Amino acid sequence: MNKDLTTGKPEKVLWGFCLPLFGSIIFQQLYNIADSLIAGKFVGENALAAVGNSYEITLIFIAFAFGCNIGCSVIVSRYFGAKEYHNVRTTVHTTLLSGAVLCALLMLLGFFGCHKMLTMIHTPEEIMVDSRLYLMIYIAGLPFLFFYNIATGIFSALGNSKTPFVFLACSSVANIIMDYIFVRFLAMGVAGVAWATFICQGISCVLAIVVVFRHLGALQSEKKAVWFSMPVFLQICTVAIPSILQQSFVSVGNIIIQSLINGFGASVIAGYAAAIKLNNLVITSFTTLANGISNYTSQNLGAGKYERIHDGFKAGIKMVWTLSVPLVLLYVIAGRWMVYLFMDSSSGSAMDTGILILRILAPFYFVVSVKLVTDGVLRGSSMMGAFMIATFTDLILRVSIAAVLSSKLGSIGIWSAWPVGWALGTMLSLFFYFRAKKNHFLLKSREMVQIEEEEKLEV
């Protein structure tokens, strides 16, 4: 069911729209966590390290899929808010075609460059074979990753956050069951973990695309949509390319950090792999909520209801802080139990590393959540320059501080770099948002850009 986000009390609208998104990403992260958890419990510490080591490289591919998601989602939201349904369809068609080409290129790069990428991050010899095996199967499933992300972006743009939730809930439960069967009973090791994800993502992707086209069929318009539009493609690129660059540079930064971590041995790698999965559960959840705020912002921008944007910003901050409280308490108080899920009692050093990481990062979720909400408004308003500056500042600081402190303090210096980067990145995002609000750039200038974009699309 499509939902108009331009009417109703902003706080109530956002809670109703974003909570299913939050539930969706929780399920998605659960089956990501299941990969590491089952590998660590039933195959061993090296298997956990191999999956965690490969994960940082998979984030580069996810960055491109996410860029397609947010680029399509923001533009579709704007046209849906403006009731220009023919342009909604044109945007979807254009994204699917361009996404297919991009996916094919990345698959070629991945298949031929897999070993080189693992070597570049100083992957230890004892986990090289498993890391490469996991990564190759993951790359084979890239079409499912891409088209599923595009589909969920379309659902969100149309105000439908419940359908992706149902898909992900079913897929995640199936993935966890298949992980267990493939690894525990069929003894497939790391390959079993990867194939379980491949199969479940494939089924979810096909079902999601079918439902997307059913939803599009319900949008009636006198004007005819086209299968590819260069003006629409360029609009998508103005949002997607900065998002891809931002996510890619973040992934590259994480890979650099992973290469620093790899110098401390398999135990530290395994501890980091467990902790970063738990950390990413929170960060990715907040990022997904911020994407919902981007859709809310973009729909209201398209409808010309500018006064609702700041109300949505304030409601978003309340929402993420409300969710942060139990998550911070859980990680600080029950961190040992959470990390223990990924490994057995013999992995004492790895467990200590994971617990330390969680206790350093968790209190700062209140800070980074503000940045992510602010970034959501900036993206929804197509203020990609400001968004990228704040994000790159965070990234550069984290990588630089990690490199310097790790040589002096050991691995604890790496974990300490995150809060500093988050804090300064948040301050920059808030600065750009309030400057835009004060100067009415967010309101008036974007209205002019929207008019110009509509004129370009007149046929």
What do the PLM-derived regions correspond to, one by one?
Residues 21, 25, 37, 74, ...:
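Transmembrane alpha-helix boundary and packing residues in multipass membrane permease domains
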Residues 28, 32-39, 62-69, 73, ...:
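Alpha-helical transmembrane segments and their lipid-water interface positions
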